[in-house]
Amino acid sequence: MRKSLLAILAVSSLVFGSAVFAADLEDNMDILNDNLKVVEKTDSAPELKAALTKMRAAALDAQKATPPKLEDKAPDSPEMKDFRHGFDILVGQIDGALKLANEGNVKEAKAAAEALKTTRNTYHKKYR
């Protein structure tokens, strides 16, 4: 009886642990989405920089996660490598927009941030 109870507890902790992990990825996606809206609407350099900085942190954190669609894949699988590569692209695009924002080029930074949507759409089709 005791072994059965321990086995049930171990399995349930794994199940609930992965659900929490998926929520972290979802939270990061929400942060990216919410701040992309700020980037699109703002004309304020400080607000733009803050939104891009939050997006960068969320992208780096999300890159460490495994999307539900890839839970059965090994961490070094081609699919997981491609998933992470998508975040490398995204972070590079955010860095480019952030550089422009830091130079005071708000319009150019916002235009550069448009590429974020293309990257998002491409990788959502694959892994969402």
Swiss-Prot record:
Heme b binds at residues 29, 124. Residues 1-22 form the signal peptide. InterPro entries: Cyt_b562, Cyt_c/b562. Electron-transport protein of unknown function. Keywords: Electron transport, Heme, Iron, Metal-binding, Periplasm, Signal, Transport. It is found in: Periplasm. GO terms for cellular component: periplasmic space. Its cofactor is heme b. NCBIfam families: PRK15058.1. This is Soluble cytochrome b562. GO terms for molecular function: electron transfer activity; heme binding; iron ion binding. Its main location: periplasm. GO terms for biological process: electron transport chain. The keyword Signal applies. It holds the Pfam family Cytochrom_B562. It comes from Salmonella typhimurium (strain LT2 / SGSC1412 / ATCC 700720). Gene3D superfamilies: Cytochrome c/b562. Binds 1 heme b (iron(II)-protoporphyrin IX) group per molecule.
